[in-house]
Amino acid sequence: FADDIVALFPEPGSAIDVALEIHRRLQLFNTSPLASEHPTLCCAGVGYGHVLAIGPNLAQGDEMNRASKLGEDIARGNETLVTQRVHDAVAAREDIVFERQDHDDLLFPFYRVTEAE
């Protein structure tokens, strides 16, 4: 069972912040009395670039496609993966760590994002 959410942000740092906050909150939820025996997890993919808006609720573009692939097919529970463009835009941040990843099926570079210790 899976649900997808697409959210647009003015810059990629905000998208990363929200993804990491979702992971934190789900970890708290999973330790609460409301949690089931199966943990609730989030897999996130983040891209950065121009999108083509098609009506009020749909957008398309290369980075949207890459982010979707990363979030839906590659990321594991509580993992945020970002494209090269996201990495390049926010690489100077000291509060997060980027780990370059390899995947045989993908033709584009991507990174795993975690909070710095």
Where are these regions (language model features)?
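Short glycine- and acidic-residue-rich catalytic loops of nucleotidyl-transferase/cyclase enzymes
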Residues: 1-3
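Alpha-helical scaffold within the catalytic cores of cyclic-nucleotide enzymes
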Residues: 5-44, 48-50, 62-69
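Short, solvent-exposed loop/turn segments at secondary-structure junctions
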Residues: 8-9, 51-55, 89-90
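Catalytic cores and conserved motifs of cyclic dinucleotide signaling enzymes
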Residues: 55-58, 78-80
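Short, surface-exposed, charged loop/turn segments at secondary-structure junctions
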Residues: 58-62, 94-96
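Generic structural signal for isolated residues within well-ordered alpha-helices
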Residues: 69-70, 89
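Arginine/glycine-rich "motif VI" loop of SF2 helicases in the C-terminal RecA-like domain
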Residues: 71-76
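Intrinsically disordered, glycine/charged-rich C-terminal tails and inter-domain linkers
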Residues: 77-117
